[in-house]
């Protein structure tokens, strides 16, 4: 008999729940259309559902008619976007994750104090673009350990570092170690920039890996935290697949023996996770499902003031 070990926490985090509720509440309060800058979260199922309900996802504010309402995605935006929205008389609502906003504020503060900011993250990720926009002349993005050796700062330059919220804890630890080795005086926030949900999902998966021979991460290919979950398994030599629907689960799993771990990125709906479990049961009729609870999450973020009742 084979088992699926269902990692917990998995799926939606508080920031994703808040962001989706912002769009839903705006549609309920004002009706369609509601414009959203960038995908509200990186999950095709969520985005397609909101499109059906009247949300219009855009990348350029020029696609929003003057005077209309626009929501900023959970990933955050650079300040210039707010300025453009104001100039075009748009009614903007900010669904940026509270934990991303914290990093924006820290970058702005330390740049104003004369620090050079090291931002650990993926240069092209929308979250990193938004954070860097707070102080573009002061922020240098570092993606990997090798980048640290190429930094131009000498030991007399005041340095502060933060990270993208959805990175691999393994990668962050390696880059942080390299930064501190080269710049012992570098400082950072009192708590990790990697968000609680990213940490919990990675650590929960790590806890079950010794018991499994294969991992499914349910999440969108665009989702940074979903990709990092896949890497957590692969770095420990456990085969892993990132899938976003039951249609992506093939009979490949029949070529592997032993138990299977299932986890999901922070923007993956629970009903998609359960449909993937059902697909596995079709392929393996005697499959048993076991929940592994690493920790419980009770974090709730308040909606923007424009949508509070």
UniProtKB/Swiss-Prot annotation:
GO terms for biological process: dimethylallyl diphosphate biosynthetic process; isopentenyl diphosphate biosynthetic process, methylerythritol 4-phosphate pathway; terpenoid biosynthetic process. InterPro entries: LytB/IspH (IPR003451). Isopentenyl diphosphate binds at residues 42, 75, 125, 223-225, 267. Keywords: 4Fe-4S, Iron, Iron-sulfur, Isoprene biosynthesis, Metal-binding, Oxidoreductase. The active site is at residue 127. Pathway: Isoprenoid biosynthesis; dimethylallyl diphosphate biosynthesis; dimethylallyl diphosphate from (2E)-4-hydroxy-3-methylbutenyl diphosphate: step 1/1; Isoprenoid biosynthesis; isopentenyl diphosphate biosynthesis via DXP pathway; isopentenyl diphosphate from 1-deoxy-D-xylulose 5-phosphate: step 6/6. The keyword Transcription does not apply. Its EC number is 1.17.7.4. (2E)-4-hydroxy-3-methylbut-2-enyl diphosphate binds at residues 42, 75, 125, 165, 223-225, 267. Binds 1 [4Fe-4S] cluster per subunit. It catalyses: isopentenyl diphosphate + 2 oxidized [2Fe-2S]-[ferredoxin] + H2O = (2E)-4-hydroxy-3-methylbut-2-enyl diphosphate + 2 reduced [2Fe-2S]-[ferredoxin] + 2 H(+); dimethylallyl diphosphate + 2 oxidized [2Fe-2S]-[ferredoxin] + H2O = (2E)-4-hydroxy-3-methylbut-2-enyl diphosphate + 2 reduced [2Fe-2S]-[ferredoxin] + 2 H(+). Its cofactor is [4Fe-4S] cluster. One of its GO terms (molecular function) is 4-hydroxy-3-methylbut-2-enyl diphosphate reductase activity. [4Fe-4S] cluster binds at residues 13, 97, 195. Gene3D superfamilies: 3.40.50.11270, 4-hydroxy-3-methylbut-2-enyl diphosphate reductase, catalytic domain (3.40.1010.20). Dimethylallyl diphosphate binds at residues 42, 75, 125, 223-225, 267. Belongs to the IspH family. Catalyzes the conversion of 1-hydroxy-2-methyl-2-(E)-butenyl 4-diphosphate (HMBPP) into a mixture of isopentenyl diphosphate (IPP) and dimethylallyl diphosphate (DMAPP). Acts in the terminal step of the DOXP/MEP pathway for isoprenoid precursor biosynthesis. This is 4-hydroxy-3-methylbut-2-enyl diphosphate reductase. It comes from Chlamydia abortus (strain DSM 27085 / S26/3) (Chlamydophila abortus).
């Amino acid at each position: 008999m084979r088992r699926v070990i269902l990692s917990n926490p998995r799926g939606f985090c508080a920031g994703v729940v808040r962001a989706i509720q912002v769009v839903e509440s705006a549609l309920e309060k004002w009706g369609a259309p509601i414009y959203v800058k960038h995908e509200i979260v990186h999950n095709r199922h969520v985005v397609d559902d909101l499109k059906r309900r009247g949300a219009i996802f855009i990348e350029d504010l020029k696609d929003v008619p003057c005077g209309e309402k626009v929501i900023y995605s959970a990933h955050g935006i650079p300040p210039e976007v707010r300025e453009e929205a104001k100039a075009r008389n748009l009614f903007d609502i900010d669904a940026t994750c509270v934990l991303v906003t914290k990093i924006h504020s820290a970058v702005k503060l330390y740049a104003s104090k004369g620090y050079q900011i090291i931002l650990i993250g993926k240069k092209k990720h929308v979250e990193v673009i938004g954070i860097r926009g707070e102080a573009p002349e002061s922020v240098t993005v570092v993606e990997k350990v090798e980048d640290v050796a190429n930094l131009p700062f000498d030991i007399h330059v005041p340095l502060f570092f933060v990270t993208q919220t959805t990175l691999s804890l393994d990668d962050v630890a390696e880059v942080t170690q390299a930064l501190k080795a080269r710049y012992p005086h570098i400082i950072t926030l009192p708590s990790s920039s990697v968000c609680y949900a990213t940490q919990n999902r990675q650590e929960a998966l790590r806890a079950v890996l010794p018991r499994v021979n294969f991992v499914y991460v349910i999440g969108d290919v665009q989702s940074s935290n979903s990709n990092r979950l896949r890497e957590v398994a692969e770095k420990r030599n456990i085969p892993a697949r990132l899938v976003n629907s039951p249609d992506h689960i093939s009979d490949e799993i029949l070529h592997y023996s032993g138990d299977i771990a299932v986890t999901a990125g922070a923007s993956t709906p629970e009903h998609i996770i359960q449909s993937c479990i059902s697909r596995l049961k079709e392929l393996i009729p005697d499959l048993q499902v076991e929940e592994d609870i690493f920790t419980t999450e009770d974090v709730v973020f308040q909606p923007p003031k424009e949508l509070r009742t």
